[in-house]
């Protein structure tokens, strides 16, 4: 089975392949732009994108919408994480949190899979925002996010370490387990 991952990020595709290759599923990157609506939840954004793409893409595909939710910022950047990263970056988040004691945050990933029907899979990892960027691995907000139970940021971890505990890794695992059961 071939499965398209609709994303412009090749790093996400490599991460996904690790979960699906053992199932005999070939994941390939499909660079197609789709509208990302302004909505209250990642689930709404992912669902809209999948339904829009279903009218334009042949065969099964999935997409991922993820967000960083910072408690002291009332969940900001949340559903606006991609836009916020492009405009103010992680330095902007650090600036907004200057002097703030509450550094609690979580990452959430929502995967929307379309095979003629919509299937949603989610993953979440709790943690906190570092006081300064650390590490050179990963992408996005990885240099400032420290997952619960660790003293290193995602950017200081190997790809394998991060994937084992990350929000996207958890959502991909849930999706792969579902696919394994439903491909029979």
Swiss-Prot record:
HAMAP family linked to this entry: Non_canon_purine_NTPase
Metal-binding keyword on record: yes
Subunit structure: Homodimer.
Protein name as catalogued: dITP/XTP pyrophosphatase
Binding site for Mg(2+): 36, 65
Enzyme Commission designation: 3.6.1.66
NCBIfam families the UniProt entry points to: PRK14821.1, RdgB/HAM1 family non-canonical purine NTP pyrophosphatase
Active site: 65
Similarity field: Belongs to the HAM1 NTPase family.
SUPFAM superfamilies: ITPase-like
Top EC class of this enzyme: hydrolase
Gene Ontology process terms (BP): nucleoside triphosphate catabolic process; nucleotide metabolic process; purine nucleoside triphosphate catabolic process
Nucleotide-binding listed as a keyword: yes
Tree of life domain: Archaea
Membrane-spanning segments: none
A Pfam family of this chain: Ham1p_like
Entry keywords, A to Z: Hydrolase, Magnesium, Metal-binding, Nucleotide metabolism, Nucleotide-binding
Reaction(s) catalysed (UniProt annotation): XTP + H2O = XMP + diphosphate + H(+); dITP + H2O = dIMP + diphosphate + H(+); ITP + H2O = IMP + diphosphate + H(+)
CDD domains documented for this protein: HAM1
Cofactors required: Mg(2+)
MF terms (GO), sorted A to Z: dITP diphosphatase activity; ITP diphosphatase activity; metal ion binding; nucleoside triphosphate diphosphatase activity; nucleotide binding; ribonucleoside triphosphate phosphatase activity; XTP diphosphatase activity
Organism this protein belongs to: Thermococcus kodakarensis (strain ATCC BAA-918 / JCM 12380 / KOD1)
